């Protein structure tokens, strides 16, 4: 042994022993210093009086009372609700807990939920009363309450709300307040500058008028709200535009819950004196909630896949992404493939939850050069083992407006440098949708074609078979080589035919004008 090296090491260790023995033991995990900051920041926004959380988490006693449950739902990732896979994409509004934070809660529960020094408990964040974004510049409320029955299928109803604007306005934020959040599932906003919505409303004796989607393309799509959506101001100086004299048309999807109730929802607008900093829009893949995707899920299918791709024709920057499906949705994924072959995730969620649909806002805008391909994969579980399956035993499920039907779309919010880039992207989306319409017509499956005929937007109503058959015959007449398909050259006049007719118009506008 080299004693010259051994003894200096022993001497050094001996010098440190007194300090090691005097070291403070680890501080126990307490509510005041460790748990309260996590709960107040990540949970209380929903778990407070008047919000969607079923109970409040606003102080030590309320959190202690639910401590075991909190430990369980944070441990399995159920709460806080955040369904994008961790570590794949960075989002600025990520409210999920990190593994160390989850372990901290588990340690606190295991230790018996000690409070610690109450003086060290942080103050609750300042939450606005009523409107989550603060008092709006304009609060628009449904003129009349609508009676929602206790039982029955989903209801799609449009309500006209006059805005009475005497000048054009730019809008930086919109907040929807459901009158009865227990029955309001999701909504779509439209603007009507034609007066048609008032005419439709006047013809219907009940408040509002029946319908899903746009009525013959008269209304301009503005946006929407789903369960789980949190209102936020548009980022990067972006704005919505509302022309003077426009009416707001709110399409509400009601889901009867066994109790008769009334709903009189409101929409709050926050105005901006500045116009939008850049043109912007949305890229839905596939368009219009997947209506022309041909979604057809066999009974018992454990993992039914639907895929769609769209090539972006112009340079743009993505700033947010959102997914939509119904109860059978399982995985929702969007990936960008660049022209050099490299790829980048935009959304990857392996645990889709119908009850929580929100915008995922990128930490930084993502540049998507012209020629970037957006690849979407949507997975559905129609097996008896799916606890969310609304039908037992499982049945075949196709596209439809009701929650027991299915939909599927991933929507990317993007910014452009010029309006010409934006319009070119809209036109590419119209062509994409026209190709899907052609595919469905040639397949002869009209299960999701009702709205194309101008009067059969909902199942059970007599379908426009004559117009669909006529359109199908017109397409087959373009099959010059008689192979029962339309090749690339044959599709050129077919696409022109679809775009010039009422088919795309009846499906509504693509993006924002």
Report residues per predicted region:
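N-terminal secretory signal peptides that target proteins for export/translocation
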Residues: 1-5
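Bacterial N-terminal signal peptides
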Residues: 8-22
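Aromatic- and Gly/Pro-enriched helix-to-coil junctions and flexible linker segments
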Residues: 21-165, 173, 177, 245-251
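Conserved beta-strand positions that form and line the central face of beta-propeller blades
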Residues: 30, 56, 233, 474-477
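Secretory-pathway/luminal and periplasmic proteins that interact with or process carbohydrate-rich
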Residues: 45, 114-117, 257-259, 499-505
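A mature extracytoplasmic/lumenal domain signature
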Residues: 50, 61, 254, 338, ...
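Beta-strand-centric surfaces of beta-sandwich/beta-rich domains
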Residues: 81, 86-91, 121-170, 175-317, ...
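Calcium-binding acidic motifs and repeat modules
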Residues: 429-513
């Amino acid at each position: 042994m080299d004693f010259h090296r051994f003894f200096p090491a022993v001497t050094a260790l001996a010098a440190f022993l007194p300090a090691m023995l005097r070291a403070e033991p680890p501080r126990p995990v307490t509510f005041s210093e460790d748990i309260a900051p996590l709960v107040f920041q990540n949970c209380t926004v929903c778990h407070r009086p008047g919000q969607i959380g079923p109970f409040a988490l606003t102080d030590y006693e309320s959190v202690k009372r639910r401590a075991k449950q909190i430990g369980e739902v944070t441990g399995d990732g159920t709460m806080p609700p955040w369904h994008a896979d961790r570590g794949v994409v960075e989002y600025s509004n990520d409210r999920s807990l990190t593994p160390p934070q989850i372990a901290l809660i588990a340690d606190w529960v295991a230790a018996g939920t000690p409070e610690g020094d109450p003086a060290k408990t942080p103050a609750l964040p300042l939450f606005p009363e009523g409107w989550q974004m603060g008092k709006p510049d304009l609060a628009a409320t449904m003129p009349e309450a609508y009676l929602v029955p206790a039982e029955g299928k989903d209801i799609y109803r449009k309500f006209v709300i006059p805005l009475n604007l005497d000048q054009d306005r730019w809008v930086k934020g919109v907040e929807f307040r459901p009158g009865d959040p227990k029955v309001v599932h999701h909504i779509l906003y439209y603007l009507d500058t034609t007066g048609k919505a008032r005419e439709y409303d006047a013809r219907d004796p009940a408040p509002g008028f029946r319908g899903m989607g746009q009525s013959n393309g008269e209304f301009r799509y503005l946006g929407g709200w789903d369960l789980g959506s949190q209102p936020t101001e548009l980022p990067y100086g972006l704005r919505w535009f509302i022309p003077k004299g426009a009416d707001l048309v709110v399409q509400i999807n009601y889901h009867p819950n066994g109790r008769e109730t009334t709903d009189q929802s409101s929409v709050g607008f926050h105005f901006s004196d500045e116009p939008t900093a850049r043109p912007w829009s949305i890229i839905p893949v596939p368009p219009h909630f997947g209506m022309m995707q041909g979604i057809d899920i066999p009974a018992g299918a454990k993992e039914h896949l639907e895929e769609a791709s769209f090539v972006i024709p112009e340079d743009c920057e993505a700033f947010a992404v959102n997914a939509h499906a119904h109860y059978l949705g399982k995985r929702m994924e969007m990936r960008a493939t660049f022209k050099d072959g490299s790829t980048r995730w935009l959304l990857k969620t392996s645990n889709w939850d119908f009850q929580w649909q929100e915008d995922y806002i990128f930490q930084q805008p993502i540049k998507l050069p012209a020629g970037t391909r957006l690849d979407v994969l949507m997975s559905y579980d129609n097996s008896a083992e799916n606890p969310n399956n609304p039908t037992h035993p499982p049945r075949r499920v196709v596209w439809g407006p009701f929650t027991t039907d299915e939909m599927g779309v991933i929507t990317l919010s993007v910014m452009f440098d010029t309006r010409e880039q934006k319009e070119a992207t809209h036109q590419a989306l119209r062509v994409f949708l026209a190709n899907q319409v052609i595919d469905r017509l040639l397949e002869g499956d009209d299960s999701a074609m009702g709205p194309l005929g101008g009067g059969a937007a909902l199942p059970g109503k007599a379908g426009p078979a004559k117009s669909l058959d006529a359109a199908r015959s017109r397409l087959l007449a373009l099959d010059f080589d008689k192979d029962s398909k339309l090749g690339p050259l044959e599709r050129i006049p077919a696409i022109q035919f679809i775009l010039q007719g009422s088919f795309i118009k009846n499906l509504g506008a693509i993006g924002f004008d």
